[in-house]
Amino acid sequence: MSQNQQREQLGSRIGFLLLAAGCAIGLGNVWRFPYIAGAYGGALFVFIYIGFLLAVGVPILVMEFSVGRAAQRNLGAALQKLEPKGSRWHTFGPLSLIGSYLLMMFYTTVAGWMLAYCWSMLKGDLSGLTPEQVGGFFGGLISDPTSSCLWMGVAVIFCFTVCGMGLRRGVERVVKFMMVGLFALMIALVVRAVTLPGGEAGISFYLMPDPEKLTGGLWAAVTAAMGQAFFTLGLGVGSMTIFGSYIDKSRSLTGEALYIVLLDTVVALMAGLIIFPACFAFDVDAGSGPGLVFVTLPNVFNSMPGGQLWGMLFFVFMSFAALTTIIAVLENIVAYGIDVLKWTRKKAVTVNFVLVFLLSLPCALGFNVLSGIQPFGPGSMILDLEDFIVSNNLLPLGSMVFL
């Protein structure tokens, strides 16, 4: 069976849309977006961010789709097939693959934290803890090398198992289930958050522009919004190119890109409607960085009636968002082995499982065994370096290749 025939095995257009949206919808929407929006003034940042999505994100997404549909391959093989004779565009293929590996090096660690919190919420480990104890719980998780590597490994094993099941029976079926579950959980969480007493102040902060709330200056907000637009769509490393190979030639690439950007934006905005009303209702800082998800929100859930249930649902939702992105990016990595190196799917999955797990260890160990490595000075971690390389450099620069 040819590779082209294999790609046509996606069961439906909705399968394509949810799969591509699953790649875009991830921690960038529900872990990164709310705390960055909170740090840069709420609504004003949101408007700048949406402007970048429409002006830059959609055109580059269309370009990535067009390369994939024209070649019916992943980015590495597509560039080899489409480049003019004598040119060297194909050299970007391995570079884009490196970008995907770098993204997975820290993404899998954070996904592992989400899974750990799901399990802990289910068992009630965080129920009744004081704010200091909740902070100590997160600190204990990331400072324990065994726990960090174990939960990172669970995320890697699960996602590669899905990829190993094949495109249609594994990737499409699992991601469709997770995406439907993600939207259902999100709606329930939004309804609960916006009905909290005092939550209207958070809604106002989030949706009403106020330049006086803009900390760090307008230029800082603009650059943060641009980086977030590239990060959330996964542009610049070729992850979206492979999904272009699944688009029927009768479909408009711009239309499909707009649908995916719309789904991605809805999730990001709804994540804010979960987090900001909850934070304002319980008088906590909505711009407190990644600790917002792992320390602040568990304290909020502990203050709510039925908080254990809502906390568990929230971290299931977060896990779905993280895992769908990992599965989609890993499918792109696996496809490189199949299309370019002519490996079987089984070999591509096996080799890359070992590689991704080993590459993810520095980040998982960066908060404990390797905590002495502080690339940006005291307090910084290996995760910060990997995030900076990907979000602020590889994604924007890689996107320029498609222009």
What are these regions (language model features)?
Residues 1-31, 60-65, 69-94, 213, ...:
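Membrane-interface "cap" regions at the ends of multi-pass membrane proteins
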Residues 2-6, 10, 172, 176-323, ...:
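Membrane-embedded translocation segments of transport machinery
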Residues 4-8, 36-40, 70-95, 108-168, ...:
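Inter-helical loop and helix-membrane interface segments of multi-pass membrane transporters/permeases
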Residues 8, 37-63, 147-148, 395:
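Extracellular loop-to-transmembrane helix junctions
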Residues 14-52, 238-244, 255-258, 262-263, ...:
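Transmembrane helix-boundary motif of multi-pass solute transporters/channels
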Residues 15-21, 94-97, 125-165, 234-241, ...:
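Transmembrane alpha-helical segments of multi-pass small-molecule transport proteins
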Residues 39-44, 70-75, 85-88, 124, ...:
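Juxtamembrane helix-boundary/capping and inter-helix hinge elements in multi-pass membrane proteins
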Residues 322-328, 349-367, 384-403:
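Hydrophobic alpha-helical segments of multi-pass membrane transport proteins
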